[in-house]
């Protein structure tokens, strides 16, 4: 008997790996172990690889290294040795190679305006509009943002052991820089633990903090350990907190009032995230502020019933404490932790930005630009960029090539979706409208709809890279072959960046900017590819994939600068983030579309403090 139920695979083309998972725990006692093997076969039945599979309690998982497979369809067959009934399990995956794989578009070591080269002197790093002084924790001692100090005192690592408060012996701060980034190496020691930090500050002032917590010379029980960020209360009237996976209804507006503890993370829902962790917190005012963020709490030691983020006001100081440890533990091995810090504003606003008379158009759908799958598609039908060429001609001449459009409808739209007359009519209207619209744009900026958070599930690229790009660890790998209205949510990993940027280049080099719809943190559950991890209780803590989304948008913005010299038309990049305004991502945009939601179900206008915070 052959079946696929309870047998899952995930194929990762970029690393030539295959994950397999088989769960027969409902057929076996917990104290029993199944043994078997997994075979990878090509279309002719030739064996590519065979591995043993051990399944204690009826569950087993393996991660296989494969060769770089040629194009084709492959079978994955699992068979068991000691199951009462003879059963085999089978799945298939496809490998196709694409011209965009492994490209370096947008990966540049240049500094484009309005950013400025990163400079350092002593322990101080300067970026556009901001100056940071670093300390032995690899954190900020001072933050001068838009001419004002926003910290009330140095950021610190505070904690307590069974012997009392932690006492630190700090070492030197080693700073180096190049035009695009500065690096800080720092070390602080106590008897209970040692902290080694590598902090990288980039041109937009975003600092990636990679922190290692090591057992000290005299390990002790650590009761709590926190990153403490004291801010000047008079400069912090607003806040913005993100729940991973939510583009709307995130806490924003006026910062909580009062003295003492005014807020803690256990008070705010965090969606699929486990415990009380929230991935993004910004505190500030209309002109300046400071953001802390992380993909998740990997490497932390926490109690799900206690807050890991606490906001306390004492006199004129508002302190954000991030509890890396909030339950007793004695370190026995190195724990690695990654988070980010960024002060705002991240770059100067364009001159006379309030007087802009023309808002670039995008149409709200990519059907206007010859893309058949609405919203989630990235390229014209059949990857035929003659449609983009005709858009360029219509824009330059002010005339529409009616013959081309008629042939496009007949040879592309009616052929590809012939079985759906309603969609044929809809896509036909869209391409005529898009071509007519751009013929009147002239030198005004024009954007195309380029969905950020999802990919077309009918595309061959998705069929091959679905496990690498999707948010789930394993799926049924069964997707609708009908033209979808949207698509499957993606994570922004390197191979997806390569794919999207390759097609973005085709559009931008022809003078069309990007409208990136639905930009917000997601919940990536893949423990093989992301910061997601399996907790002690066996549950998976997802990753908000903020770092991946940051790299995606940075690459696209840098590519836009490279493409500007290739076209006479002005290029702009827009993100639609609604209520997901996170500094490390939206920095890399020229336009931000906000507030596509309703305050109190539309019964009241947005309060001024919400508009200021957003």
Please name every model-derived segment.
Residues 1-17, 23-25:
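Short, compositionally biased P/S/T/A/G/V-rich stretches that sit at domain boundaries
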Residues 1-4, 30, 49, 56-60, ...:
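Carbohydrate-recognition beta-sandwich/jelly-roll modules
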Residues 18-24, 28-52, 62, 74-78:
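Beta-strand-rich binding/interaction modules
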Residues 375-379, 453-458, 521-526, 580-584:
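Flexible loop/turn segments at secondary-structure boundaries
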Residues 397-509, 595-596, 601-605:
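Active-site-adjacent "subsite" loops/lids of carbohydrate-active enzymes
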Residues 456-487, 544-614:
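Glycan-recognition surfaces
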Residues 495-583:
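Active-site neighborhood of glycoside hydrolase catalytic domains
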């Amino acid at each position: 008997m052959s079946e696929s139920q309870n047998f899952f695979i995930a194929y990762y083309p970029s690393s030539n790996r295959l994950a397999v998972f088989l769960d027969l725990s409902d057929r076996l006692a917990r104290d029993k172990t199944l043994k078997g093997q997994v075979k990878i076969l090509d279309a002719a039945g030739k064996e590519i690889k065979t591995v043993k599979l051990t399944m204690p309690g009826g569950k087993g998982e393996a991660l296989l290294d494969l060769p770089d497979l040629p194009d084709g369809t492959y079978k994955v067959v699992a068979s068991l040795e000691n199951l009462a009934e003879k059963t085999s399990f089978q799945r298939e995956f496809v490998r196709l190679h694409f011209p965009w794989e492994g490209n370096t578009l947008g990966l540049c070591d240049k500094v484009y305006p309005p950013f400025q080269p990163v400079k350092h002197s002593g322990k101080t790093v300067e970026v556009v509009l901001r100056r940071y002084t670093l300390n032995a924790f690899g954190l900020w001692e001072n933050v001068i943002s838009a001419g004002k100090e926003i910290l009330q005192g140095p950021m610190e690592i505070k904690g307590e052991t069974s012997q009392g408060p932690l006492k630190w012996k700090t070492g030197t701060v080693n700073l180096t820089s190049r035009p695009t980034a500065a690096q800080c190496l720092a070390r602080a020691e106590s008897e209970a633990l040692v902290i080694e930090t590598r902090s990288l500050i980039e041109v937009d002032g975003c600092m990636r903090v990679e922190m290692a917590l090591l057992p000290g010379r005299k390990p002790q029980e650590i009761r709590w350990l926190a990153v403490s960020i004291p801010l000047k209360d008079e400069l912090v009237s607003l806040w913005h907190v993100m729940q991973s996976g939510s583009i709307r209804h995130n806490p924003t507006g006026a910062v909580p009032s009062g003295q003492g503890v005014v807020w803690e993370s256990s008070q705010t829902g965090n969606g699929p995230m486990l415990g009380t962790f929230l991935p993004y917190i910004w505190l500030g005012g209309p002109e300046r502020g400071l953001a802390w963020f992380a993909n998740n709490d990997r490497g932390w030691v926490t109690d799900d019933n206690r807050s890991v983020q606490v906001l306390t006001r004492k006199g004129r100081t508002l302190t954000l404490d991030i509890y890396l440890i909030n339950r007793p533990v004695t370190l026995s091995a190195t724990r690695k932790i990654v988070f980010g810090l960024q002060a705002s504003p991240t770059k100067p606003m364009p001159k006379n930005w309030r007087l802009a008379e023309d808002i670039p158009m995008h149409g709200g759908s990519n059907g206007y630009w010859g893309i058949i799958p609405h919203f989630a598609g990235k390229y014209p039908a059949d990857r035929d960029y003659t449609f983009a060429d005709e858009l360029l001609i219509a824009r330059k001449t002010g005339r529409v090539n009616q013959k081309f459009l008629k042939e496009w409808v007949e040879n592309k739209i009616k052929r590809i979706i012939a079985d759906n007359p309603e969609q044929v009519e809809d896509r036909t209207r869209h391409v005529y409208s898009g071509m007519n619209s751009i013929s009147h744009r002239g030198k005004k900026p024009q954007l195309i709809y380029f969905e950020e958070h999802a990919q077309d599930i009918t595309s061959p690229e998705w069929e091959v890279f679905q496990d690498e790009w999707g948010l789930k660890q394993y799926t049924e790998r069964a997707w609708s072959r009908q033209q979808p209205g949207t698509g499957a949510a993606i994570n922004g990993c390197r191979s997806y960046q390569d794919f999207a940027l390759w097609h973005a280049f085709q559009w931008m080099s022809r003078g069309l900017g990007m409208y990136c719809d639905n930009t917000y943190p997601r919940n990536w559950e893949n423990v093989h590819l992301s910061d997601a991890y399996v907790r002690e209780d066996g549950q998976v803590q997802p990753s908000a994939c903020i770092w991946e989304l940051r790299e995606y948008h940075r690459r696209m913005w840098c590519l836009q600068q490279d493409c500007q010299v290739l076209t006479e038309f002005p290029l702009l990049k827009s993100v639609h983030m609604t209520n997901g305004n996170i500094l490390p991502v939206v920095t890399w945009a020229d336009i931000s579309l906000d507030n596509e939601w309703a305050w109190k179900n539309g019964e009241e206008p947005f309060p001024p403090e919400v508009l200021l915070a957003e």
